Amino acid sequence: MHLFKIISFIFFSSIIFAQNYSLESVDDCAACHDEIVQQWQTSMHALSTLDQDVLYRGMYEWAKEDTKGKITKKCKNCHTPYFYLSDTMLVNKEDRKRPVDCLYCHSIDSLHLEPKFSPMKYAANDNSLSDYHTIQGRDHFENEKLCMQCHAELINPNQVAICTTGDEFYNQSENKSKCQSCHMPNVKGYKSSESDSVSNVHTHAFLGPHNEEFLKGSVKISGKVNGNTLTITIDNSKTPHSFPTGTPLRMVLLKVIGLDRNGKIVYQNWQKNPVNEDKQALFARMFMDEKGNMPSPPWRAVKVGNESRLKPGEVRKITYKLSDAVSKISAKLFFQLAPVPILNKLKIDDPYLRKAHLIDEIEMELN
């Protein structure tokens, strides 16, 4: 990924720069930006390390054992971006364990062919009024380019694209919303302790699927019945990337239940496993290994075996045949951060990871 180039460039390019650069802590930032740091502390950026992210740790240890450690450096590029900094120049062993934090993102000067870091602080706009440090404005804080350093793509050793958010975004032309519009929306607050008044500030909670409220309504569903045919419409028109996106562990499930006049369940589109019972109700990206096994761990993949996610901007219609006994329909769309069998294998009991999170739901009376 591009991030490795970023890190390599900065920390191996200038000994003079390294000698003058110090790694401030998040606590230093909190002295003036307490409100923003509190938001960040709830984010997955703050929890990106092996110590804090139980799913990342489980997948990392599995990949490490399965590949004899050959691919784990790719994981650390983004989860602990200080990892690749030179021992002799900048970062001690403890700092190498730091998550994606204030200093890392706000020290990025430019994102051209060779991204450049600097001890200067950067943000969306210039600010020379601070007593503590000067801030220079950079465009990449107001577009997708900074985010895409980690969220664009991940290629496995077999040259199979594992994460494809960047391609999804750049290959669609209908919606060019910037990442920050949804994942860092404006909230009322103080930019720093020096601020005289409340203003609109981009939240640094970095909203995503680990925030249940953020998930709700991110994709909408609706239904229509014509005779004995039920059509469920799933609307991803507001999203400029596939849904779900990011790690291929994520999946979206559609559950349809039909009730008779007495409230008894007389129809279900699937009961135990949509992969076997109703493939059109599963929205996911699955990989196949060289032996034809699917799903395959991402690092073993030789090709994509199934791609059923909602495309950027897609509105998909799914039909079901109902019996005359069905009097009422309930349809729910759920988001799961990882398949339960994977969580079982990794011995992860985290309730949020195991929960099917409701995105949207409808109920329809048929007669």
Where are the regions that the model predicts?
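N-terminal intrinsically disordered, low-complexity tails enriched in polar/charged
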Residues: 16-19, 367
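Short, conserved sequence motifs used for protein processing/export or organelle targeting and
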Residues: 155, 173-176, 180-181, 185-367
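Sequence context of c-type cytochrome heme-c attachment sites
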Residues: 18-173
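Sec-dependent N-terminal signal peptides
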Residues: 2-16
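A generic alpha-helix preference that emphasizes hydrophobic side chains
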Residues: 15, 37, 102, 144-147, ...
